[in-house]
């Protein structure tokens, strides 16, 4: 379905953006970039989970099974595992700098899987349909297209809001011993 396709695309885009910030963190050694990547990972992981879960619920009546080892499903599951690995590694190491470097490797290596997820329906004979919305038009009824557009806007607003709230939390957690953070805490501005 188009809604599930949008969730697939969102998880892939979030992973690519996360990998970019991982790369920037390694190249520039700026502390902010890994914090942004760490803030994106849980939302991307949630989107990956939602795509797999709702896809399996849709797949049961459509394919007769909750799970089939389809190229799109399998590559999306691998991307979900990359998200889980990133989050687990980030939380397993109390030294933020070391965790950021190790997570950057996962972020950069995992981005190789993104084109596989995206192009799997074109490269292999899969159970998934091709794109419903293309440059040449849409195969979706206009009423459903509007509903899809509203859902996409809502999900993106949610994604931005949650990511920025999480980024604020990560910054304050990592910088809690810095003078500026302590002064803001004393003023009650946190």
Which sequence ranges carry the predicted segments?
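Hydrophobic cores of alpha-helical transmembrane segments in multi-pass inner/ER membrane proteins
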Residues: 9-21, 78-90, 146-164
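Hydrophobic alpha-helical membrane-insertion segments
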Residues: 103-119
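Short, small-residue-biased leader/transition segments that mark boundaries at the very start
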Residues: 1-8
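Membrane-interface transmembrane-helix boundary segments in multi-pass integral membrane proteins
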Residues: 5, 123-157, 179-190
């Amino acid at each position: 379905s188009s809604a599930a396709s949008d969730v697939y695309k969102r998880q892939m885009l979030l992973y690519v953006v996360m990998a970019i910030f991982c790369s920037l963190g390694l190249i520039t050694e700026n502390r902010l970039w890994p914090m942004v990547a760490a803030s994106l990972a849980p939302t991307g992981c949630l989107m990956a989970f939602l795509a797999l879960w709702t896809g399996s619920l849709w797949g049961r009546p459509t394919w007769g099974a909750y799970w089939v080892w389809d190229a799109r499903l399998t590559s999306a599951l691998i991307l979900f595992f990359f998200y889980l690995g990133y989050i687990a590694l980030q939380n397993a190491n109390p030294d933020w700098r070391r965790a950021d470097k190790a997570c950057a490797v996962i972020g950069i290596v995992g981005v190789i899987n993104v084109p596989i997820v995206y192009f799997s329906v074109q490269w292999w004979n899969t159970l998934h349909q091709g794109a419903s919305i293309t440059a040449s038009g849409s195969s979706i009824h206009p009423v459903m297209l509007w509903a899809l557009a509203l859902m996409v806007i809502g999900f993106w607003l949610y994604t931005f809001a949650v990511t920025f709230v999480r980024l604020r939390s990560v910054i304050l957690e990592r910088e809690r011993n810095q003078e500026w953070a302590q002064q803001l805490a004393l003023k009650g501005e946190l």
